[in-house]
């Protein structure tokens, strides 16, 4: 479920006074911290996943990991399949916000700012409102920020980080 060892799971239960849900959340956060540390490591192996839906929609997704051992692992291939299904269903335009061209981000920020000012919102709150509008806009269009199709309570990025925690390798 979390990919942590029995000792770590037991420690999490002790730390949360036996509350299973809190222990599970603590282990997930610990796994995401480990995943972020692994983010620095180079991913040289991986697979290209594909999905075709009714001969109308086709998706090719490249997902990389550090070793060919993990690339052949069933959990990794399941992760790749899930990402393919998500891309087919959600049609993201970018992988992450960092991939959006600066000109497009600036143009959207200006458009949203003009809209907020035209609506008569207070100037001191305008920047905060625009920031929220940009975040929502990109959450709909950037793969890693989209709600994961199989579990809308988490983003695709969180799903991938769970995979990193379980597999013990960086995934990009």
Briefly describe each language-model feature range.
Residues 1-172:
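N-terminal assembly/interaction segments in proteins that build large macromolecular machines
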């Amino acid at each position: 479920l979390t990919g942590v060892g029995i000792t770590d799971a037991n420690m999490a239960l002790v730390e949360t006074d036996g509350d299973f849900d809190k222990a599970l959340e603590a282990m997930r956060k610990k796994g995401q911290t480990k995943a972020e540390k692994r983010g620095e490591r180079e991913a040289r192996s991986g697979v290209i996943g594909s999905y075709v839906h009714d001969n109308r929609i086709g998706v090719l997704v490249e997902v990389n990991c550090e070793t060919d051992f993990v690339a052949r692992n069933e959990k990794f291939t399941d992760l790749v399949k899930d990402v393919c299904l998500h891309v087919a269903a959600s049609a993201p335009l970018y992988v992450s916000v960092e991939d959006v061209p600066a000109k497009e981000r600036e143009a959207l920020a200006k458009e949203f700012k003009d809209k907020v000012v035209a609506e008569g919102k207070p100037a001191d709150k305008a920047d905060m409102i625009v920031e929220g509008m940009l975040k929502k806009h990109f959450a709909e269009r950037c793969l890693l920020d989209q709600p994961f199709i199989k579990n809308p309570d988490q983003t695709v990025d969180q799903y991938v980080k769970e995979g990193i925690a379980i597999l013990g390798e960086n995934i990009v």
